[in-house]
């Protein structure tokens, strides 16, 4: 299953705010209530919608998300929390959380087009897993810096999560530590997502 490229507002009306996909939000709570009036949601549908929130927010294909779930399941600790940490530490998401891109798809384009360095080396893989003490910068070119500046000028003044530091005048971000679960950028019930996949196998 490929990445979603359809109307973004259609997804946030069904699933709620997806800041990684779009800065738009449902116009009112009634947008979400209207979706639920078609009937009582089954437990399967509730789990499915939580999974879809995660997939659309981070811009993943179904296959990619399943791979992350399997990696998280083999790691020490809570599978759901490890899953969120893996997704939050992706390079495209780190750029988004730093405010260097307005959405995760926008961050993915910056990486794909060769504008981003990690520890001084060009990285063109959006799924690159960032680690504590990684330093993320833009290429020292006017075009690259102009793109980042435009994003930073237009980005909402969201509170920067504690695991990141932004030096905006240097177009530089620093990963201080692995993200704590309370700083994850999406309201989602990760346990329902783990349950969804456990019932598919």
UniProtKB/Swiss-Prot annotation:
Against Gene3D superfamilies, the record matches this protein to: Ribosomal Protein S4 Delta 41, Chain A, domain 1 (1.10.1050.10), RNA-binding S4 domain (3.10.290.10)
Location of the protein in the cell? Plastid, Chloroplast
Q: Which InterPro entries match?
A: Ribosomal_uS4, Ribosomal_uS4_bac-type, Ribosomal_uS4_CS, Ribosomal_uS4_N, S4_RNA-bd, S4_RNA-bd_sf
Give Gene Ontology CC terms.
Answer: chloroplast; small ribosomal subunit
Residue intervals of the S4 RNA-binding domain: 89-169
Q: Which family does it belong to?
A: Belongs to the universal ribosomal protein uS4 family.
Record text on subunit structure and interactions: Part of the 30S ribosomal subunit. Contacts protein S5. The interaction surface between S4 and S5 is involved in control of translational fidelity.
* Biological source species: Nymphaea alba (White water-lily)
Q: Which Pfam families match?
A: Ribosomal_S4, S4
Functional summary from the UniProt entry: One of the primary rRNA binding proteins, it binds directly to 16S rRNA where it nucleates assembly of the body of the 30S subunit.
The annotated region (Disordered) lies at 16-43
RNA-binding in keyword set: yes
Keywords assigned by UniProt?
Chloroplast, Plastid, Ribonucleoprotein, Ribosomal protein, RNA-binding, rRNA-binding
Spell out the PANTHER family in the cross-references: 30S 40S RIBOSOMAL PROTEIN, SMALL RIBOSOMAL SUBUNIT PROTEIN US4M
Which HAMAP family does the protein's record reference? Ribosomal_uS4_B
Q: What is this protein called?
A: Small ribosomal subunit protein uS4c
Recorded GO MF terms:
rRNA binding; structural constituent of ribosome
- What does the record list as GO biological process? ribosomal small subunit biogenesis; translation
């Amino acid at each position: 299953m490929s990445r979603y490229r359809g109307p973004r507002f259609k997804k946030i009306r069904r699933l709620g705010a997806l800041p990684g996909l779009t800065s738009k939000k449902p116009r009112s709570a009634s947008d979400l209530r209207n979706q639920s009036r078609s009937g009582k949601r089954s437990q399967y549908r509730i789990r499915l919608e939580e999974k879809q929130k995660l997939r659309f927010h981070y811009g993943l294909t179904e296959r990619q998300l399943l791979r992350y779930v399997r990696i998280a399941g083999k790691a020490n600790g809570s599978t759901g929390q490890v899953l969120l940490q893996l997704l939050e530490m992706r390079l495209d998401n780190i750029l988004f959380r730093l405010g260097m891109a307005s959405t995760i798809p926008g961050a993915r384009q910056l990486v794909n087009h060769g504008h981003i360095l990690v520890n001084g080396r060009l990285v063109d893989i959006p799924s690159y897993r960032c680690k504590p003490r990684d330093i993320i910068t833009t290429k020292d070119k006017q075009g690259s810096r102009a793109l980042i500046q435009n994003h930073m000028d237009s980005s909402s003044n969201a509170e920067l999560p504690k695991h990141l530091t932004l030096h905006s005048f240097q177009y530089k971000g620093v990963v201080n530590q692995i993200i704590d679960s309370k700083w994850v950028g999406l309201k989602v019930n990760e346990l329902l997502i783990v349950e969804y996949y456990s019932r598919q196998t």
